[in-house]
Amino acid sequence: MRKSFFFSALILLAATGTHAQDVNTQSCEKGNGQACYLAAIEMHKAKNFGRGADLAQKACDLNYAQGCFYLGFNNQNGSKYSQCNVFYKKACDLNLGVGCLALANNVRLGIGVNPSLQAAMPFYQKACKLGEPLGCSHVKNPGFEGHMGHLSGGKSEISKH
């Protein structure tokens, strides 16, 4: 009896996950950016990274900021640094604080762009305004990590997506 219940529960959980994934995919096809993002996460969990990236791209194209951040993070993990900053910039433009923070860190450290604390500061300020505590830490004390002396004061260009 116990094995039967456990097996039934597993089938129900699997069916529920598949159903939710199907609902998100259908809603995504109808232009729901949040559904595209949620479907992308499900694809990522299933290790279907290509499909996940496609769904996240659709979410980003629909101006769903988390989809843009997902693409930025995946590109950065794949060492596509200049491309990751394009997606972080769009996430920031769509008022996702963590997108602003990620972009600011990359600009400050020179990941995908020339390093520039000066160019990073507006992104830290926006991250702070959007509630990201680390953004506020950089605004209050730009040198708080102690290794910023090597950074130039020049401007970094982040292309728009």
PLM regions and their residue ranges:
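Sec-dependent N-terminal signal peptides
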Residues: 4-14
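Sec/Tat signal peptide C-region and signal peptidase I cleavage site
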Residues: 16-20
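Short helix-capping/linker turns of helical repeat alpha-solenoids
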Residues: 31-32, 43, 62-65, 94-97, ...
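Hydrophobic face of amphipathic alpha-helices that form TPR/SEL1-like repeat modules
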Residues: 36-45, 68-78, 102-109, 138-144
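Terminal, low-structured helical/coil segments at or just beyond the last alpha-helical repeat
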Residues: 131-161
